[in-house]
Amino acid sequence: METLELQGAKLRYHQVGQGPVLIFIPGANGTGDIFLPLAEQLKDHFTVVAVDRRDYGESELTEPLPDSASNPDSDYRVKRDAQDIAELAKSLSDEPVYILGSSSGSIVAMHVLKDYPEVVKKIAFHEPPINTFLPDSTYWKDKNDDIVHQILTEGLEKGMKTFGETLNIAPIDAKMMSQPADTEEGRIEQYKRTMFWSEFEIRQYTHSDITLDDFTKYSDKITLLNGTDSRGSFPQDVNFYINKETGIPIVDIPGGHLGYIQKPEGFADVLLNMWG
């Protein structure tokens, strides 16, 4: 893996291929290896970069998180993630780059576009679970508060079951999300990673400071992506609302919420049609 030294962290990332830079931002998984099957499909067209977000995988913190980062209203980590992606983009290319964020990674991508538009050539939001600008935002904020409380008091298994039911996660995704790692060490790491995401991201990222105006001013750069196998899920409803209010197009893409793993060939074909 490659390394970029940043304030407070060593950011690690996979890099394959040649051509214009395309950065993938992972969601709850946090690690870029989840995009490697997709990267193989795109490496003849792009320099594909898949990031281990700060606090995940091989990326290392060199300074501790501030105590306030676990506050439900803290924007520290999502803003830090966005700054990391912008600094990575600048280190890799003198030109604006392509960016795709999936799930909570797409919320990071929104903050990249809002705060660092100069690094973005084109950007895609794949099934973002953000609620800040929705008419029923308070309802969804309260639901996420309840989910995190359940995880912390009743355990991860019960809380994640409620999470899946509340967001109407498709069976194809629920099965993959609940699949344990192959080794005991892997299962321990998986548990720690999911608990970290629960405490530091479910509430903070989904209710972070993004408005519809943040999209309309850059609408020519944005594509919304909804999976063909995750119809009816909350993240798709978010994209439908953005589309209705701004006119930014939605493109159907193969697979579900984890379509880049489930159907990497078809996922890549859509990206090449968009950006190739």
UniProtKB/Swiss-Prot annotation:
Alphabetical list of InterPro entries matching this protein: AB_hydrolase_1, AB_hydrolase_fold, AB_hydrolase_sf
Name this polypeptide is given: Uncharacterized hydrolase SAOUHSC_02900
GO molecular function, one term: hydrolase activity
Region feature Disordered, mapped onto this chain: 57-76
Family the UniProt entry places it in: Belongs to the AB hydrolase superfamily.
Annotated keywords: Hydrolase
Chain ranges of the AB hydrolase-1 domain: 20-137
Pfam families: Abhydrolase_1
UniProt-listed Enzyme Commission number(s): 3.-.-.-
Entry superkingdom: Bacteria
Lineage per the UniProt record: Bacteria, Bacillati, Bacillota, Bacilli, Bacillales
